[in-house]
Regions:
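A structural signal for multi-pass alpha-helical bundles of membrane permease subunits
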Residues: 2-284
Length: 284
């Protein structure tokens, strides 16, 4: 009797989980399916010219596959390509810089205890939890004094000094046995050698998962570019997607699919490292 109740309970939980998965996938399926429809069908559906109801507009399955939108985006919309490279040129330096600084800072907080280190790390956590809206004014003042407004440095520098990587990597480094560090010191290794030859190989999966999360976070930033960048041609792709629905809805779905492609590729490539990183960190 008890086993039957457990099976019923597990089945009920699976049904609920499946329901939420389907709900989460509907917007993605909607975007992908409509990216495969022609311009005429898209315009007729979303400009009210077709005479069909709203529910009929939400059809997920395309009537036929048409790559017209992708062709126009990739070969007839140079603005999309330009903003794509803008986004890549902003995000990649942030990921590299933040992860490198995060490794050094995490090592300092976890293996080089000094007076006030716990309080300083607490400030790191507070800064990580602060939303962008809280720091927008002081950030703007500082960046303006440095002459970085309307330059990519206004986005890259604050991103490099973000605290997420430090917080995430510190949790893992604290669990590394001090005996490894002491043995390396006895062999004559300095701190940089310990980090490069010992800790980085041991933290490889955590570092990769951290880099992936930083990439996904900054790939989709919108408020920072709008605030610190005044020239629209310097905007990243994430800002462009916010206006394309009203300006060029006929290619908006294809732009959204292409925008999601790179983060999806990153997640699929490093899926094992990402899940392993979360699992290891949760155990710490």
């Amino acid at each position: 009797m008890e086993s039957i109740q457990k099976q019923v309970s597990k089945g009920f939980i699976r049904i609920i989980m499946l329901f939420f998965v389907v709900i989460a996938l509907i917007p993605i399926l909607f975007i992908v399916s409509h990216s495969l429809k022609g311009e005429t069908l898209i315009l007729s559906r979303f400009t009210g010219e077709s005479g069909i109801s709203v529910w009929q507009q939400l059809i997920i399955r395309p009537f036929y596959i048409n790559l017209e939108q992708f062709y126009k985006v990739l070969f007839r919309t140079p603005q999309f390509i330009n903003l794509f490279w803008n986004a890549l040129g902003i995000t990649v330096p942030i990921v590299i810089g933040q992860v490198l600084l995060g490794i050094l800072a995490a090592y300092g907080f976890s293996k080089m205890k000094f007076p006030g280190s716990d309080k300083l790390f607490f400030l790191y956590v507070i800064m990580m939890l602060m939303p962008f809206q809280v720091t927008i004014v002081p950030n703007y003042i500082v960046l303006n004094q440095l002459g970085l407004i309307d330059h990519y440095g206004a986005l890259i520098l604050p991103g490099i000094f973000g605290t997420f990587s430090t917080f995430f990597l510190k949790q893992f480094m604290e669990g590394i046995d001090e005996a490894f560090i002491e043995e390396a010191r006895l062999m004559g290794a300095n701190d940089m050698q310990i980090i490069y030859h010992l800790l980085v190989p041991m933290c490889k999966r955590i570092i990769v998962s951290t880099a992936m999360m930083v990439f996904i976070n900054y790939w989709g930033m919108v408020e920072e570019p709008i605030t610190f960048i005044t020239t629209k041609s310097k905007y990243p792709l994430s800002v462009y997607l916010g206006t394309i629905a009203s300006e060029n809805i006929n290619i908006g779905f294809a732009c959204s699919v292409l925008y999601m492609f790179l983060p999806l590729l990153v997640v699929l490539y490093g899926q094992e490292d990402l899940t392993s990183g979360f699992r290891i960190t949760s155990l710490k």
